[in-house]
């Protein structure tokens, strides 16, 4: 299914398949990608297991390579890319990001007001984001020179209880902030 939202389009499909992107994008190239791939940490959401979140490192790398390669084919030469990820899988994400043809420009940190409940020694009140662009291109930057790599936005309170069903829902102001820096 493809939904049109003004000039934008959203598809529900398999990001590892080129035909998903071909159906969504046609000949149009994206100016920005902001994605939240599975974190590969075996989490559950309100409706059960998150698809592909239980993959091992090798399978996770192969999954990301397919997705990132498909994304690159449909991104403008001067586009930017934001990828949210889990710190415990940093190497998998960075390796796939770079091997698929992207340059890492920065690691950004979204500082959350509180840590979600997790059965870990350290509670993560932050979420890392890879910021980058195509190695064969450049990127646009519209932010000033005062932007820091750590920023704080309120999370979505009780997102799972309110029916969002995602253990780490992203607040709209956070996404709007990221978009405004590059488009």
What is each of the regions a protein language model found here?
Residues 1-183:
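Core catalytic lobe of class I
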């Amino acid at each position: 299914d493809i939904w049109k939202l003004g000039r934008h389009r959203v598809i529900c499909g398999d990001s590892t398949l080129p035909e998903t992107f071909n159906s969504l994008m046609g000949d149009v190239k994206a100016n920005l990608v902001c994605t939240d791939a599975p974190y590969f940490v075996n989490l559950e959401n309100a409706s059960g297991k998150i698809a592909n979140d239980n993959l091992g490192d090798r399978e996770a790398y192969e999954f990301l390579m397919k997705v990132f390669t498909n994304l690159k084919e449909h991104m403008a030469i001067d586009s930017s890319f934001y990828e949210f990820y889990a710190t415990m899988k940093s190497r998998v994400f960075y390796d796939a990001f770079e091997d698929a043809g992207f340059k890492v420009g920065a690691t950004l940190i979204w500082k959350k007001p509180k840590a979600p409940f997790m059965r870990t020694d350290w509670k993560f009140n932050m979420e890392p984001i890879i910021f980058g662009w195509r190695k064969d291109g450049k990127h646009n930057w519209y932010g000033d020179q005062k932007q820091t790599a750590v920023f704080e936005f309120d999370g979505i309170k009780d997102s799972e209880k309110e029916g969002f069903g995602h253990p780490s829902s992203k607040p709209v102001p956070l996404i709007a902030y990221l978009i405004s820096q590059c488009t």
